């Protein structure tokens, strides 16, 4: 639980980073796009189909935007919740959800990037609501971990998502994978054990809550694959975000009022003396939405496999950038552990791909 507290802005020329952290970006998994009729809009953005831009340049720009938004939201979250002194991770997560709801509505209803889909039944509504609850748990835990562990360690923990996905898939659906797939998970786990034992800024609570965030992302992925299976209930990723975001904001509201009850008063008082906080929160919330938008665009212009490969690279890049900017201490063993985990994730992806090909024959 994160207690409400008064504002404390840290002004240090060379701060120590023994309690730094970061969180996974606010993001939803991309399900398969159901069949639908194409939609057009006079405001449809140029980045979806621009005859004047080379496809190669367009794809490169989208990938660059994807990297920028994913790493940017991590660094902004870290700066706000630790260095700037904004100690309200639940409220921050709620602003992310409100931003995603507003931007999703504009992008779908006005810009027409994808056709609007509607919730067709009470059962479908309850399914999306359950996903929103898991979504909240994952993101709030990730944001809370900002205050305790560094970005690099957070990304190492986040890379273990395939392990938790395999565990939940077995526990919930009794689905088993090939021996090769399970063996590939060994370096995923052993790498994070190695990194944890040699992490200079290790914090037990930060570690546990970051693990909870990673497990929550995996659980959401598995549950989403189970409850949104029928063609009539499948939603495009952008439509799913459109409905999940406001539900998540409503779920978070009572928690932020109870746990962080003085956040609005503190925010108003702070804004009077330092208006920068308003721009930081607005920018942070916007970048949080851009993570989801660029996720969709990368998949549209490349493939889901490309997105998976980029995700593996993003963890390493984000960790490196955070060390350069915030200069949190790292060790050779910690770097080696992170590398082993990333290698395990790559091996896991390849093993699953081969397993699927064998099952299709």
From Swiss-Prot:
<feature type="transmembrane region" description="Helical">
    <location>
        <begin position="276"/>
        <end position="296"/>
    </location>
</feature>
<feature type="transmembrane region" description="Helical">
    <location>
        <begin position="90"/>
        <end position="110"/>
    </location>
</feature>
<feature type="transmembrane region" description="Helical">
    <location>
        <begin position="125"/>
        <end position="145"/>
    </location>
</feature>
<keyword id="KW-0813">Transport</keyword>
<keyword id="KW-1133">Transmembrane helix</keyword>
<feature type="modified residue" description="N-acetylvaline">
    <location>
        <position position="2"/>
    </location>
</feature>
<feature type="transmembrane region" description="Helical">
    <location>
        <begin position="306"/>
        <end position="326"/>
    </location>
</feature>
<feature type="transmembrane region" description="Helical">
    <location>
        <begin position="329"/>
        <end position="349"/>
    </location>
</feature>
<keyword id="KW-0762">Sugar transport</keyword>
<comment type="similarity">
    <text>Belongs to the TPT transporter family. TPT (TC 2.A.7.9) subfamily.</text>
</comment>
<feature type="domain" description="EamA">
    <location>
        <begin position="89"/>
        <end position="196"/>
    </location>
</feature>
<protein>
    <recommendedName>
        <fullName>Probable sugar phosphate/phosphate translocator At1g12500</fullName>
    </recommendedName>
</protein>
<feature type="transmembrane region" description="Helical">
    <location>
        <begin position="240"/>
        <end position="260"/>
    </location>
</feature>
<keyword id="KW-0007">Acetylation</keyword>
<feature type="transmembrane region" description="Helical">
    <location>
        <begin position="192"/>
        <end position="212"/>
    </location>
</feature>
<feature type="transmembrane region" description="Helical">
    <location>
        <begin position="153"/>
        <end position="173"/>
    </location>
</feature>
<feature type="transmembrane region" description="Helical">
    <location>
        <begin position="56"/>
        <end position="76"/>
    </location>
</feature>
<dbReference type="Pfam" id="PF03151">
    <property type="entry name" value="TPT"/>
</dbReference>
<dbReference type="InterPro" id="IPR050186">
    <property type="entry name" value="TPT_transporter"/>
</dbReference>
<dbReference type="InterPro" id="IPR004853">
    <property type="entry name" value="Sugar_P_trans_dom"/>
</dbReference>
<keyword id="KW-0472">Membrane</keyword>
<keyword id="KW-0812">Transmembrane</keyword>
<dbReference type="GO" id="GO:0016020">
    <property type="term" value="C:membrane"/>
</dbReference>
């Amino acid at each position: 639980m994160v207690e409400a507290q008064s504002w404390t802005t840290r002004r240090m020329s060379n701060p120590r980073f023994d309690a730094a952290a970061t969180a996974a970006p606010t993001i939803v998994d991309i399900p398969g796009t159901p069949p639908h009729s194409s939609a057009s809009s006079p405001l449809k953005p140029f980045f979806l189909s621009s005859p004047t831009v080379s496809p190669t340049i367009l794809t490169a720009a989208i990938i660059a935007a994807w990297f920028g938004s994913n790493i940017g939201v991590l660094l902004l979250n870290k700066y706000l919740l630790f260095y700037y002194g904004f100690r309200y991770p639940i409220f921050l997560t709620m602003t992310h959800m409100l931003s995603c709801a507003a931007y999703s509505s504009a992008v779908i209803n006005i810009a027409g990037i994808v056709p609007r889909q509607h919730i067709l039944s009470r059962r479908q509504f309850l399914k999306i609501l359950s996903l929103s609850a898991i979504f909240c748990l994952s993101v709030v835990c990730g944001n809370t971990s900002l205050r305790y562990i560094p970005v690099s360690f957070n990304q190492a923990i986040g890379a273990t998502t395939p392990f938790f996905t395999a565990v939940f898939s077995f526990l919930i659906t009794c689905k088993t994978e090939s021996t090769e797939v399970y063996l590939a998970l060994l370096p995923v786990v052993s790498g994070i054990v190695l990194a944890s034992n040699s992490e200079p800024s290790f914090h037990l609570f930060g570690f546990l809550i970051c693990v909870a965030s990673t497990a929550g992302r995996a659980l959401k992925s598995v549950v989403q694959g189970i409850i949104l299976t029928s063609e009539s209930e499948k939603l495009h990723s952008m439509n799913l975000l459109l409905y999940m975001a406001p539900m998540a904001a409503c779920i978070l509201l009572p928690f932020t009022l109870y746990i962080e009850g003085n956040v609005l008063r503190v925010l108003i008082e702070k804004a009077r003396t330092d208006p920068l906080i308003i721009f930081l929160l607005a920018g942070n919330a916007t970048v949080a939405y851009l993570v989801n938008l660029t996720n969709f665009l990368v998949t549209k212009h490349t493939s889901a496999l490309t997105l998976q490969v980029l995700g593996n690279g993003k963890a390493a890049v984000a960790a490196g950038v955070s060390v350069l900017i915030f200069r949190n201490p790292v060790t050779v063993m910690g770097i080696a552990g992170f590398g082993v985990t990333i290698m395990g994730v790559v091996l896991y992806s390849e093993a699953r791909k081969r397993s699927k090909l064998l099952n299709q024959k």
